[in-house]
């Protein structure tokens, strides 16, 4: 992979997802922002014993300028995400689970919103929809939080919380100041998101794109 800079980097920890990871990667490749010019994927194989690693290696060979493949001994999702941070070359970063996916307009809408509000926020989030076994809005996307794209000041609108890392995008400069805590077995992503929001007491919501949560 060259020293090229990207608009968006996506870090995907990979473990036992050979049935789903190709669909996840394809949802990033098909982004209407233009994958080869503007998007980087960092695939971190967390010592997966199934065929996930082979699938990831094939994609990295197909898109050598855009996809970085990294192998590590199994250490958990937090360590895998922290490992992925060492390879990012994008202005904004998403941590995507390896069995989820994005709507095709997600990256372009998020990038434009960030550029319009760059000095105000470190984080932008999108609504989530359940798919496959269950369908409908994710419990964290119910209510009127995503009724319109806007900047939320949590000091004024403290009821509009955001906890889910995979539906969020973070400025890479801000992201590098915080690591995921590998000692936490649950809720490590919520802690990470909250730390990012508290830096400015504001974050953005974009109403149109959808993060699909399996």
Residue map of PLM features:
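Short, well-formed alpha-helical segments that are part of the catalytic scaffolds
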Residues: 17-31
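Glycine-rich, basic loop-to-helix element that forms the pyrophosphate-binding segment
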Residues: 72-88
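A conserved acidic beta->alpha catalytic loop
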Residues: 27, 45-54, 75, 97
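Conserved nucleotide-sugar donor-binding catalytic segment
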Residues: 148-214
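Conserved donor NDP-sugar-binding/catalytic core segment of glycosyltransferases
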Residues: 105-138
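Short aromatic/hydrophobic "clamp" motif used to bind/position activated sugar donors
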Residues: 93
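Short beta-strand/loop segment that forms part of the nucleotide-sugar
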Residues: 37-47, 68-73, 98
């Amino acid at each position: 992979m060259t020293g090229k800079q990207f608009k968006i980097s996506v870090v995907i920890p990979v473990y036992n997802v050979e049935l789903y990871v190709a669909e996840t990667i394809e949802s990033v490749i098909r982004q209407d922002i233009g994958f080869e010019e503007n998007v980087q994927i960092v695939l971190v194989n967390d010592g997966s014993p199934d065929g996930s690693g082979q699938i990831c290696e094939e994609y990295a060979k197909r898109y050598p300028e855009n996809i970085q493949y990294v192998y590590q001994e199994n250490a958990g999702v937090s360590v895998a995400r922290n490992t992925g941070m060492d390879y990012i070359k994008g202005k904004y970063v998403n941590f995507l689970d390896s069995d989820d996916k994005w709507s095709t307009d997600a990256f372009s809408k998020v990038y434009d919103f960030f550029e319009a509000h760059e000095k105000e926020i470190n984080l932008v989030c999108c609504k989530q929809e359940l798919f496959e076994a269950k369908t409908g809005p994710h419990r964290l996307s119910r209510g009127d939080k995503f009724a319109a794209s806007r900047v939320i000041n949590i000091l004024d609108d403290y009821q509009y919380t955001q906890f889910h890392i995979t539906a969020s995008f973070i400025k890479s400069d801000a992201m590098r100041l915080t690591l995921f805590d590998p000692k936490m077995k649950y809720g490590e992503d919520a802690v990470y998101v909250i730390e990012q929001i508290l830096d400015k007491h504001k974050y953005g919501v974009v109403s149109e794109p959808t993060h699909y949560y399996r």
